[in-house]
Amino acid sequence: MKRTLPYLICLPLLANGPLVPLAPINEAGFQKLVDSHKGKVVLYDFWATWCAPCRAELPQLALLEDKLRSRGLEVVTISADDREHKAAAEKFIQMFRVDGPAYLKQADNDDHFINAIDPKWSGALPALFLYDKAGRKVRSFIGETDMAALEKAIRKVL
């Protein structure tokens, strides 16, 4: 709670930026996304507005991306919210000025989507998947993640 309190206090100040549109993405689109980011270290963040640990983690990820962007890190957010909650998800990422690519999962079959991302992943949120410059998944972080451990893992592949 201590880590998220400053962000909660600043929410009214942050809510004035432009709305970040969430592009739809399915399992085939995710693979194309990974392929298009080859040459960069990318952290894919799967989250949802109803997931309390996700909401706490998102502003920390935005700060981490700001810190490591010059070294080549890009954070891509993918909301697992239902389509009818797209506006709420867009508003949430707007509050934290998430300026990287942002998507909304739109798969006809959640199990197929989850399996395409990582066959070992249960679909639990939050979920972070770290890819190296060759487009290979090198680490997975499922559930609440220690930001120091995450940063250390990212620095190893930058």
What are these regions (language model features)?
Residues 40-42, 46-50, 82, 124:
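Short pre-active-site segment immediately N-terminal to redox-active cysteine/selenocysteine motifs
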Residues 46-63:
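Conserved redox-active cysteine motifs that mediate thiol-disulfide chemistry
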Residues 21-42, 65:
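A short beta-strand-turn-helix
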Residues 4-14:
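Sec-dependent N-terminal signal peptides
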Residues 38-40, 70, 98:
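Active-site acidic short loop of glycosyltransferases
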Residues 124-158:
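Thiol-/selenol-based redox modules, centered on thioredoxin-like
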